[in-house]
Each structure stands twice: as structure tokens, then as C-alpha cells.
Amino acid sequence: ALSNGSQFGTYLKTTNNLKFEPVKDYFVNAKVNFQSAYPSFNYLLNTSVYNNYNYYFQNAQNQTISEIGGSVGLKWFKTELFANYFRIDNYTYFDAIAMPQQSGSPVNISQIGGDATFSYGKFHLNTRLHFQNVLTNKDLLPLPSFIGRANFFFQSKAFKNAAEIQTGI
């Protein structure tokens, strides 16, 4: 998608995915994505009657995000292992005094993780582990190093198979 705008610059986004099954029940996914967009409107203009947060961010550059990654999926336990790398140029952020800034050097992020679903009848447990590291400019984008998530849910057909319900925690 490409959009040319007079007020907020250009917008460009490409999403490229490749999926194949080299061996039965094993799936390989690869992706290369790119996005170049003007910073969010929240960074450009904000006024406040409560605090001195009145600013107008001039000469902002497009923030560009490049992503490369992939995953391997296994039918066994509905498992997926993934790895991603992000490079963010002109990263836009608010500094210590709440003024918008853009980074002069890129922010680089690496991620690895996995996802699995275990099922017993109509009961399911989905777990996800996600490790990530901000490789450069950690002070601009503080992210947790580890994210873990688990969902336990019940899933069944209802109303003579006319609907499906899912509930859980």
C-alpha cells in the first residue's frame, strides 16, 4: 500500500509471506515486511490545559520498520517456534520532559519464542513463551525480556452444531 499525503507525508507498507510444507505435518513460514509512515498524530500536536505539554513537532521524518522472521509449525501439539528481527529507523518517542523526539540511530529488536496447544477432549491449554531483547537504544524502548502466557479454555459445538462456544481463563 502506498499513500502520498501533503500534510502527513507518505505511507508505504509491504507484507511478504511464504509458507510451505517441506515434510508432512511440518510447516515453514518466512516473512519480510517493511513499513514507512509518518509518526502518530499524538507525537505531532498536543495541547493541554492542565500541564505544560503544548508542543508542535516540526520536521518529523517517516518512521521505518523493517521486519524479517520466520517460524516452524508442527501439527504435534499445535506447536510453533518463531524468530523475528526488527529494525526501526527514526524511532519516535517522548523524552523525560514529555516532548516528542526522533532517534538518530536505529532501534534493533530480536525475538524468539514458541507457542503450543495441548488438548484433552473439549478442554485446551494454550501456552506461549516469548523472549526478546532490544539490541540498541534500550533506553528509548524498554521492553520486558520475557513474556509468558497461558490460556485454559473449553470449546464445544452448541445448538445442534449451528454454533461453537469457547470460554476460558
Model-predicted regions and their roles:
Residues 1-169:
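Exposed, low-structure sequence patches enriched in small/polar residues
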